[in-house]
Amino acid sequence: MRLKILIAVMAVGLCYGAVTPLNQDKLKDYLANGAPFDFILIDVRTSQELTSAIGNAACKPYNLAWPDQFKAEALKIPKDQTVIIYCRSGGRAANAAAFLIDNGYTNVYNAGGFMTWTGSTITPSEIKPLSLLPAPSMRAAGKK
């Protein structure tokens, strides 16, 4: 029994180890100065948690609450699209990123939690509607 628990803990650790973290300062730089690639920004908090979201005039996130809504909608995104995910504190973002990686996505980043975000924000009414998914949240710098 202990061996099974140890194996399960190690498997979870390996899964999280495959998720690439994205430093929030780097995300702030992308929002302020443009990114070198198109990306989709996803907030996996529930609608009840949203008082504001990461974003600005050039970058509008999607809100796909983890797990049900995220699992139902996120697979509409092309598997080679860059996806950046965040939540309140980072845990759900890690789970959502691991889900995408497990489903063959190759450019997935965990930007951690909104609680530590000090960059630009938007109101919930400015969040990108799901009907536009998989349109990027932000286009690469110099790309229209």
Name these PLM-found stretches.
Residues K4-G13:
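Sec-dependent N-terminal signal peptides
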Residues I42:
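Active-site flanking residues adjacent to catalytic metal/cofactor-binding acidic residues
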Residues Y86:
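Short, surface-exposed ligand- or partner-binding patches at beta-edge/loop junctions that are enriched
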